[in-house]
Amino acid sequence: MKRLITFSIILFSTFCAYAQDVEKTITLNEVTVKAAKVVNKADGMIIYPTDAQKQASNNCYSILEKLTLANLRIDNISHSITAIDNRGGVQIRINGIVVGKSEMLALNPKDIAKIDFINNPGVRYGDGIAYVINIVTRRNGSGYTVGMDLTSALTTLQGDDMVYGKWNKGKSELSFSYDVSGYKTKGEKSKQSADYTLKDGRIYTIERNDVESLRKSISHDAKLTYNWADSTATVFQASLSGAFNNAPDNYTVKDIVDGTRQYKATSIAKDKSYSPVLDIYFFRQLTPRQSITANAVGTYISTQTSSFYDEGAPYKYDVDGKTASLLTEVIYENRLKPFTFSTGLNNSYKYIKNNYLGDASSLTKTNNNRLYAFAEIKGMLQPFSYALGMGASFIHYTQNGHRYNFWTFHPKASLTYQINNSMQLSYTYQMQDKVSRIAMTSDAMVRTNSMEWTVGNPDLKPSHDMEHRLRVSYNTSRLQTFVEGYYKQCLKPNMAHYERTDDNQFIYTQINQKEIDVLDVYAYASYWLLPEKLQIAANGGIYRCFNFGYDYTHCYTSWFYASSITAYLGNFTLQGYVDNGNRFLEGESKGYNGAYSVLKASYTWHDLQFSLSWANPFKSNYKSYENELLNRNIHKHTVGYSKANGNLISLNISWRLSRGCKHKSAEKRINLRDTDNGIIK
């Protein structure tokens, strides 16, 4: 009760500072919007990139990076998008389809009409998704498009290169992409000090400091897609993709100080996998208001891993993993006059067979079947807009004699009050049951070092989460800003649990424990100092978490910020970005993911764009992470450094050529994907 009162006081004290007249917001389909760059809605905002932003960008990562979306770190160097607030994952879509790196690099930013940034996803998006970015294009692809995107680090061995092409004739379109990326670095090192409380009460200390390391990996991804579109009434799309990843002979040499002994220990890891994926999609406009969409994805993953570590005594195991899954989904939508109604059914079946050989001998066979149904309505009663949704899942799970049936539920309600043309207040409440990731439900047991083991727990049950979100936003033609309060209560979550054996070995697993609570208050602002020429943006706030285990209570407060400045100078673009990283406490682990800063300059010449970036400047030994374990019997402090990611200078060259007639591409409303191989590491 005290936490709820504190939460309310913080929210209302934060929200007491908005009142002034504003210009009228104008939003028109397929029309350049001059009066407002951002339009707020119940589940997020619609962003209309300016012509300057589109002209200065060479792919989707580039244009999203310039928008400085709150709580997201968008890196056009590594082609990655991550949430820095630990609320969940980020889902990227183009015209409704969940896409990957190849589609993000191939899309021409000049074809973007708007970007739908959903920071409050509805029930149809499923579990674990905190943010959805849907990039909506004008769907006017040319008769053919060919291009390439080449990125290479100049200060270390790291690269990411892709070529792509698209050809269309009549109602048909064929597209292909191939991407190869890799790295080889020797500057990844960590320092760790661990204190173990033994059965007799003595403190036993071990120091583990890296003195030499090698990290290398190469990945190949190829995708072939055929699309047939009959105007907008019927769409059929089939794609076949394949991924191959190989990380051979990575090793680390550690200097071990173990009591009175000092010696060298070596860890060696190998990882190889390949995965073909077949994706079939169908859309039919039944009537002007009704539509039905179906999607089916079949995935096969083959994984071979090997791990060796000789701290204390040699320990080696291999894993031969096979995973097959079939994911299907059907969605019906009806745009009624008072509201829009949508309902859908999603079924996923997954079979995993992981054979642990060597010192970690175990054979795990898992069958996981999940049936998810949802219904949602969205409507408007001026000056209010609302969304009501309900999802329910039935999960059937078997593994090596363990058998469980779960029902999980996901209700959600949102209400938005439009105070005036530029200011709105919104509130969202949702409940959600979450299932632990598959690897931790395995019954395999793997040694981490001479004192520690990791053990799966097939008896894990879903946790029960409740979220409250209150936001006030204010927009004008040059200023976009909001303040938000967020409170999350997790009941019976999967939390860390450590056990000490009679022979002084320490076992890490997860069990359902009491509760985790999170309070987050933050603000965001973006302002055009010079319209279409100079833009600044910043966001920041305070994060407070409470972890209540059966035998521990840990609380933690942290603050965060991110800011950027971008100048559009004709064919030149200059950009700077900085954030202070991500600090969190979950269970008994306090963590920090490193701060990030970058300076960029780009130049556009005809169909070519050249970009030069300098990431983490003046940091020759970049601090990439820090972890502290707070268990009563184990205290560990680990700091990781990366020379490769400090003072990282990268060059990007992109080229795109489009010619020919127009073709309406598929607006894929749903998409399914599976990448989890269920292996404990």
Features from the language model and the residues they span:
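Short, acidic, small-residue-rich periplasmic hinge/interaction motif at the N-terminus
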Residues: 20-53, 77-78
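N-terminal periplasmic accessory domains that precede
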Residues: 30, 60-63, 80-82, 102, ...
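Short strand-turn segments of transmembrane beta-barrel domains in outer membranes
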Residues: 51-53, 142-164, 639
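Periplasmic plug
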Residues: 73-120
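Transmembrane beta-strands of outer-membrane beta-barrel pores
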Residues: 150-154, 169, 180-184, 242-246, ...
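Face-selective signature of the C-terminal outer-membrane beta-barrel domain
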Residues: 219-247, 268-402, 406-411, 418, ...
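Outer-membrane beta-barrel signature, preferentially recognizing the C-terminal barrel domain
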Residues: 404, 423, 433-482, 489-491, ...
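C-terminal beta-signal and adjacent terminal beta-strands/loops
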Residues: 605-681
